[in-house]
Design a protein with these regions (language model features):
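N-terminal auxiliary segments of SAM/dcSAM-dependent transferases
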Residues: 2-53
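Conserved alpha-helix/loop element of class I SAM-dependent methyltransferases that forms part
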Residues: 78-96
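Conserved class I S-adenosyl-L-methionine
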Residues: 96-105
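Class I SAM-dependent methyltransferase SAM/SAH-binding core
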Residues: 106-150
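A short acidic, Gly/Pro-enriched loop at the edge of an enzyme's catalytic core
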Residues: 151-162
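A short SAM/SAH-binding and catalytic strip from SAM-dependent methyltransferases
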Residues: 161-173
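A short glycine-rich, Lys/Arg-flanked "PGG" loop and its adjoining helix->strand segment in the class I
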Residues: 175-189
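Substrate-binding/catalytic lobe of Class I Rossmann-like enzymes that use SAM or dcSAM, i.e.
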Residues: 202-291
Length: 308
C-alpha cells in the first residue's frame, strides 16, 4: 500500500476543491446531503427514543440525590426525566388558556400536558423538531421561531402559562422578561426550570441568579413558588461525567495511540490539533462535573405570577 504523504494530501484536497468538475460534484453532494438531513435526523431521534423513551431532553429529577452513578441505569434516567416533567406539571392550574412551551425540544413535556387536559403550543426554531412533534403529537400547536422573534402582536396577552424548561439560559434575560410580559395574560404564570450562576465562574452559561431575582421583581412578577433542585439533578451529572471519564477520554486516548502507531508522521503533523481536542473534551467534561456545577451554579424551579 502506498504511503500517504502530506504533499500528496494537500495536492489532492486542493485539486478536488478547485477543479471545476470536482467542485460541481461537491455541490451535488451538498444538495444530496441537505435532502438526506431529514432521514438522518429521523434516525437520530429513533435511536434516542429507543435509548430514552419519552422525548424528554432535560436533566431529570432524582428523589434520592445520593445514589451512586454506578448504580444508575438508563431506566432510572428515564424515570427521573418523567418526574422532572411532573414537577413542572404540578405548577400549572389554568386549563382554559393555552400553555406555551418555549424550546419544546422533541415534545415530551407537550405530550404530558396534552394527556393532562392542557391546550399546548410548542415553540422551537428547529424545523426537524417541528416536523417530529406535528407527526407524533398532532393536538399540539407549533410555532417555528426563536422566542426572541415571536410575533408579539399575534400572541399579545394570549397565554395563560409560559414554560421555560432549560431554555431561558439561551435567551437574553431583559429580552425574555419583556416578551413574557407582553404575551402572558395578567395573573398568568411563568414557570422557569433552569440552572443559574451563583458567582463569577469562568463558564458563562446560565443567568446570574441574583440578577434574575432582581429583574423579575422590578418587572412586576410575584414569586408564587421557588424550589432549589440542584441536589436532585446531581445524579444525572454524576452519571454522564462517570461515563465521560471511564469511556470517552480513554477511548480518545486509545484511538490517538493507534493513530500514532500506524501513522507517526501524520500524528506529528496533527499533534497540536489532537492535544486541543483532548483539552476541548476535558472542558466539556468539566461542564458536567457535578462538584464544579454545585460550586458555581444552582438549579431552580420558580413559578412567577404577572401582576396587573
Amino acid at each position: 500500500m502506498k504511503k500517504i504523504k502530506a504533499r500528496w494530501v494537500a495536492q489532492s484536497v486542493l485539486g478536488r476543491g478547485l477543479h471545476p468538475k470536482h467542485f460541481l460534484r461537491y455541490l451535488k453532494l451538498s444538495k444530496k446531503k441537505q435532502s438526506n438531513d431529514r432521514h438522518e435526523f429521523d434516525a437520530q431521534l429513533k435511536l434516542y427514543a429507543q435509548i430514552l423513551p419519552g422525548d424528554f431532553l432535560h436533566y431529570g429529577y432524582f428523589d434520592q440525590p445520593d445514589v451512586p452513578p454506578e448504580r444508575i441505569s438508563l431506566h432510572d434516567i428515564q424515570q427521573a426525566q418523567l418526574r422532572y416533567a411532573q414537577l413542572i406539571l404540578r405548577q400549572l392550574e389554568n386549563r382554559d388558556n393555552e400553555v406555551l412551551d418555549v424550546g419544546c425540544g422533541t415534545g415530551g413535556l407537550i405530550n404530558l400536558l396534552i394527556q393532562n387536559g392542557f391546550k399546548v403550543t410548542g415553540l422551537t426554531p428547529d424545523r426537524f423538531q417541528i416536523q417530529y412533534i406535528s407527526e407524533k403529537y398532532p393536538p399540539a400547536q407549533l410555532i417555528r421561531a426563536k422566542f426572541q422573534n415571536i410575533d408579539i402582536d399575534s400572541y399579545r396577552k394570549h397565554f395563560g402559562t409560559i414554560i421555560n424548561s432549560e431554555s431561558l439560559q439561551y435567551i437574553a434575560l431583559d429580552k425574555a422578561i419583556a416578551i413574557v410580559k407582553q404575551i402572558l395574560k395578567t395573573d398568568g404564570r411563568w414557570i422557569v426550570a433552569d440552572y443559574f450562576r451563583t458567582g463569577q465562574s469562568m463558564e458563562k452559561s446560565g443567568h446570574l441568579w441574583d440578577e434574575f431575582h432582581t429583574k423579575i421583581k422590578a418587572a412586576g412578577f410575584n414569586i408564587f413558588h421557588e424550589q432549589e433542585i440542584t441536589q436532585n439533578i446531581y445524579p444525572t451529572l454524576a452519571y454522564v461525567h462517570m461515563w465521560g471519564e471511564k469511556l470517552g477520554l480513554p477511548l480518545l486516548e486509545y484511538l490517538v495511540g493507534k493513530f500514532k502507531q500506524k501513522h507517526p508522521r501524520l500524528h506529528y503533523i496533527f499533534n497540536d490539533v489532537l492535544l486541543e481536542l483532548h483539552s476541548y473534551l476535558d472542558k466539556k467534561l468539566d461542564l458536567v462535573n457535578p462538584e464544579i456545577f454545585i460550586r458555581d451554579k444552582k438549579y431552580m424551579l420558580i413559578t412567577l405570577q404577572l401582576t396587573a
